[in-house]
Amino acid sequence: MNKVVSSPNMIVCQYFQSLRRLCYTIEQHDEHNKEQIQQDAALGVILAVTGVEIFVNVYFRVLVDEETYKHAAPYILNDLKKQLPLEKKVKKWPSAVFGKKLNFGEGVGQLFTNLKILRNKLVHFSSSHETIDLPGHKIQGMADTSIYSSLDTHSAINALEVAEQFICEIFRLSGIGEKEFPHALHLWTGKVPTNKTIGNIRPH
């Protein structure tokens, strides 16, 4: 395989562009086609969290090459080498690099935690092996698929919005002002800035 090099933000943009295209596709589904909506919504939730993790990996790797953040380089590079789980990275890295922590107890941090929990329930799914009693017989080995069945069009769109909001919180810690969020999102996720107010990327 030939080696291909690209700008660090390229892969992040590709994942988020894929997610936006998926959200558009879901919106075009017939509302009665619940099966397709749930299939695409599940992929949307998974892709949103994956996109954030790739962003976190690349963004912090780029930052620790800058003079201001070189103090954290050995720490971040070692964690990258160990392939630290996303949960630990988002809790440890901002403090190590910026001297500030993300708040996971409320607001965007809590929304992202909830999204990550949903994603984990989808990708780490296992049969609950339940028994259903029916008149005259039992059905054994059934799985609780309530989480999957709860997915709808909003699930994927919300996942995209929460992912973007969470990335903006990392921008905030790095010193980027709110007025620059749309341009930073464009650079790092490929989201084209519009005339909408900055409030649209804040938590609802």
Model-predicted regions and their roles:
Residues 1-42, 192-204:
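Charged alpha-helical initiation segments
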Residues 1-8, 12-15, 45, 73, ...:
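Intrinsic-disorder-associated interaction segments
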Residues 18, 22, 121, 134-203:
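Amphipathic, Lys/Arg-enriched alpha-helical patches that create a basic surface
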Residues 22-25, 29, 62, 66, ...:
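Surface-exposed polar/charged interaction patches
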Residues 38-63:
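Short, hydrophobic, well-ordered secondary-structure elements
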Residues 50, 54, 114-124, 190, ...:
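Alpha-helical scaffold segments in carbohydrate-active enzymes
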Residues 61-157, 166:
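Flexible secondary-structure boundary motifs
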